[in-house]
Amino acid sequence: MKFSELWLREWVNPAIDSDTLANQITMAGLEVDGVEPVAGSFHGVVVGEVVECAQHPNADKLRVTKVNVGGDRLLDIVCGAPNCRQGLRVAVATIGAVLPGDFKIKAAKLRGEPSEGMLCSFSELGISDDHSGIIELPADAPIGTDIREYLKLDDNTIEISVTPNRADCLGIIGVARDVAVLNQLPLVEPEIVPVGATIDDTLPITVEAPEACPRYLGRVVKGINVKAPTPLWMKEKLRRCGIRSIDAVVDVTNYVLLELGQPMHAFDKDRIEGGIVVRMAKEGETLVLLDGTEAKLNADTLVIADHNKALAMGGIFGGEHSGVNDETQNVLLECAFFSPLSITGRARRHGLHTDASHRYERGVDPVLQHKAMERATRLLIDICGGEAGPVIDITNEATLPKRATITLRRSKLDRLIGHHIADEQVTDILRRLGCEVTEGKDEWQAVAPSWRFDMEIEEDLVEEVARVYGYNNIPDEPVQASLIMGTHREADLSLKRVKTLLNDKGYQEVITYSFVDPKVQQMIHPGVEALLLASPISVEMSAMRLSLWTGLLATVVYNQNRQQNRVRIFESGLRFVPDTQAPLGIRQDLMLAGVICGNRYEEHWNLAKETVDFYDLKGDLESVLDLTGKLNEVEFRAEANPALHPGQSAAIYLKGERIGFVGVVHPELERKLDLNGRTLVFELEWNKLADRVVPQAREISRFPANRRDIAVVVAENVPAADILSECKKVGVNQVVGVNLFDVYRGKGVAEGYKSLAISLILQDTSRTLEEEEIAATVAKCVEALKERFQASLRD
């Protein structure tokens, strides 16, 4: 939110400079993002009046003027602005004036005519970007007055970040309340005198959705001049808040919005048929908005309608049909309290974000509407004329927010703050904040003010007391606690250790959103139902991820589109799997996943360009599994996964339980995702691996190891891992190593079979093995393979 410092000081004016004020606001929890002067640095510019205005004899686009600046004579000034005319009060830079950019005004001749100054536009004074013409001042602007003084340009715009819980500070009144409390000053509110009804005109108002709209006020104002100019003082206040002046009616409602934080809307009364009905939209109902776009409404969208059609989206945006235009003479002013839940998410659904919806979503003071209506009525009549009818108030007390009594205990206050604040100070702070306070023994009973939706529980009151007391005033004290050194189980494998290993292997860690595109996720996990968000950031981020692959593959595409073809990335994070047996019907699993693509090695003059394959990723994965001490218990089994290539993928099993997948991305998926070349992925359920096997020390044999190689022929569908596992079971104490070093298919091996060449390493820790023992062990191994897999020794 952006506002004028001088406007704030009209409400409360502490004796501190701008920098101190900004720091004070920040320390109060309203972070100041910036403080900027409202105008450039200049001097020598005064209010003047164009007494004469004639066409320049030598230039079609210039005019020769005589300007009264309050001196002993009129100044001759040449001006090229299209709006220059006789009788206009203007901003005049006299000779010797210095404008922003160190531009000095001197006497000169323009196309043969003398010019003793300059008539200035807003842009030339550094006030705004408007350079369409010279500044037009009110007819009563005092001639000769310094323009900085007249327009109050010695001012700053202060921009603050208002957190969602402090919706009360989305108006000058809310910020002023905080500044008043912090400086122990009274709040000087503008006098708002009720405007009595001078006509009896009303419109019938019916509220059919009291839960969504507990309070609705309407008032007819007839005979207004919508073309009346908005006063310069109001335009300037709006401009300094970042709001562009549109017309007097809209400017008045915007002014009340910025001043009091209450959104308002004006309807063209003559376009309303029958009366006002506040209801939920009908399914499929449409509304043409003020910006000309057509919105298709849902049944949960609140609308303001007449007896035939929707006129506006309640609390969000007005409709084109009932909007105020140049022909409008009679208006209906609307001022309402809409429930935050009835507005939240509705604007985003239609791609909208308005000042009104921003405030209603966070909560508007439910007792503010009468004050805002009277303020807007008075301003509208003062500027546009007209006569006001009575205020029609439709209020459902049962659905208005209720203010609960909150108990603040002395023990809780001292414990959370860590400092004792005197009872009378606590009481004073709460009352200055607007709370109704009843003191008790070692406690306070407080009722929060209507504008503070965020004060609901005891901790909220503690926060408010500490904030107003001043965090800087709470002394630093050492923590009074005993620190117990924690122990670390040797069996716990740190995920950080695994990340370090992957980093050493050239992988980079990434963090992707848990919110993913449901369409892309369905490509990776077809037929699996994901958890959908009720209020997503965007349609492309509306589902919770079922695996980390969705985000990782999107990251690969992002990098490939930026000429990064060799990618090695990994991520650890939660996946969200629907599970009726889990709490709330959703299971959260910690996963570790990775992706590689491109060349095996970085580009090098002495290395051939080789693309990564299944065994590159499998090898990296085995290094990770080796850290767990369970690599020998892990099996890679051929198992279908719709996201992976059926012939180049595997499921990973640990002790018979599946813990993940590894493989090449399915060619069809690769095409749909626009992946460039072969891409390989893996994913592991980390919690099933985190409890590692503690290494056991064993004696290193001093006796020679013996290697024997065998080649066995088995059916094509027999996994090599099963063959190796069976070999390890034979001669457990003597077979210290089993490795597959060749796979052969072709001449000499029947079709549908393969030859596996296996090396057996045999060794004993107490003696040198005899040849007979070695041969017996090898024979035993061959026999076991023959019995289980119908294997035969290859000739």
Swiss-Prot record:
Key words of the record: Aminoacyl-tRNA synthetase, ATP-binding, Cytoplasm, Ligase, Magnesium, Metal-binding, Nucleotide-binding, Protein biosynthesis, RNA-binding, tRNA-binding
Gene Ontology MF: a single term: ATP binding
UniProt family annotation: Belongs to the phenylalanyl-tRNA synthetase beta subunit family. Type 1 subfamily.
InterPro entries, per database record: aa-tRNA-synth_II/BPL/LPL, B3/B4_tRNA-bd, DNA-bd_dom_put_sf, Fdx_antiC-bd, Fdx_antiC-bd_sf, NA-bd_OB-fold, Phe-tRNA-ligase_IIc_bsu, Phe-tRNA-ligase_IIc_bsu_bact
Binding-site residues, Mg(2+): 454, 460, 463-464
Details of cofactor binding: Binds 2 magnesium ions per tetramer.
Reported cofactor(s): Mg(2+)
Name this protein carries in UniProt: Phenylalanine--tRNA ligase beta subunit
A GO biological-process term: phenylalanyl-tRNA aminoacylation
EC number(s) per entry: 6.1.1.20
Substrates-to-products reaction catalysed: tRNA(Phe) + L-phenylalanine + ATP = L-phenylalanyl-tRNA(Phe) + AMP + diphosphate + H(+)
Keyword tRNA-binding: yes
tRNA-binding domain segment(s): 39-148
Binding partners and assembly: Tetramer of two alpha and two beta subunits.
Annotated NCBIfam families: pheT_bact, YtpR
One CC-aspect GO term: phenylalanine-tRNA ligase complex
Domain (FDX-ACB): residue spans on this chain: 701-794
Superkingdom classification of source: Bacteria
Domain B5, first and last residues per copy: 401-476
UniProt-listed Gene3D superfamilies: 3.30.56.10, Bira Bifunctional Protein, Domain 2 (3.30.930.10), Ferrodoxin-fold anticodon-binding domain (3.30.70.380), Nucleic acid-binding proteins (2.40.50.140), Phenylalanyl-trna Synthetase, Chain B, domain 3 (3.50.40.10)
Top EC class, one word: ligase
Subcellular location field: Cytoplasm
UniProt keyword annotation of tRNA-binding present: yes
